[in-house]
Amino acid sequence: AGLVVALCGYLLQHFGYSAWYLCFLVPALIALLGVPLLWFGLKDDPTEVGLPPVEKMGDGAAMQKDAEPDPVSRLSKAQYKKVINRMVYANPYIWIIAVSNFCIYIIRLTILDWGASFLTEIKGMEIAKAGGLLATTEIVGGTLGMLLAGWLSDKLFQSKAHRTCFFCIVFATLSFFLFWKTESITLSFIFLIFSSFFIYGPQALFGTCASQQATKYATGTGNGIVGIFGYASSVVTGVMFGAKAEAGGWDSVFPIAIAFGVAGAIAIALMWKAPADGYEKLNKVLKEVE
């Protein structure tokens, strides 16, 4: 995402705003180049390349001969649907994660969609420089933020990634607020880096949270719901914020985005005491459906 922002800034700087369509065409062509790699290189599971299933792998990639049988494999299709329903659709933690993901994506997409406009119209930067700055915040801040968030989840919060997400959302919202209020270009750059740094922690970990709470048997469904909520936020950032900025200026947009950040922090705080994963719940559900 950061590279696309920099690319679009370069295109507009050199070809003018009348060539806006290049910002859609060029990234689309680049994306098409990746299609053959995915089609021919992406595999469904390790067995397709001669490796044993992940569940049967032990330390040092050694096969576990006495691996326990899969408790879900003996369920009927109707019973399996009940498991999915209980672990995902009737699981309040999945919906809390989804709502919180929606909120943090509001701030993320506000920066990605309108960050260049903020920097050029409010901070007075050239479009190419603004694009490069945004790319730097995404690549540097985002990458480091994801790595640190994952490390903290394991080392500090005993794999309870939702707790890491809470702190990340709080500090991402605060950084975005400070970016809005500062007039210094240098401080604006610093606060944007911090915004990306803290945003990409939840972006990476919310999928992990959903997988842990839904368990491996419903990972796809749980992540699907969380992902839909995340990208549904583009309706707010793209349509609503665009109309709001045109009518009342950018100062009318920032408070709304910040309010969503606060709401996201409150939402994820509701599952502070939640376990690291849903396998204990799964065992209870299996006993009920069998």
PLM feature spans:
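Glycine-rich segments within core transmembrane alpha-helices of 12-TM secondary carriers
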Residues: A1-C8, E138-G142, G227-T237
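A late C-terminal transmembrane helix in Major Facilitator Superfamily
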Residues: K216-A247
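Extracytoplasmic gate region of multi-pass secondary transporters
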Residues: Y89-L147, Q203, G207, T237-G238
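C-terminal membrane-cytosol helix-exit motif in multi-pass small-molecule transporters
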Residues: L29-G60, A267-W272
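Juxtamembrane intracellular "pre-TM" segments in multi-pass secondary transporters
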Residues: G50-I96, L286-E290
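C-terminal ends and interior cores of transmembrane alpha-helices
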Residues: V170-E183
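Cytoplasmic membrane-interface "Motif A"-like loop-to-helix N-cap segments
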Residues: D154-I169
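Helix-loop-helix hairpin linking two adjacent transmembrane segments in secondary transporters
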Residues: A1-D45
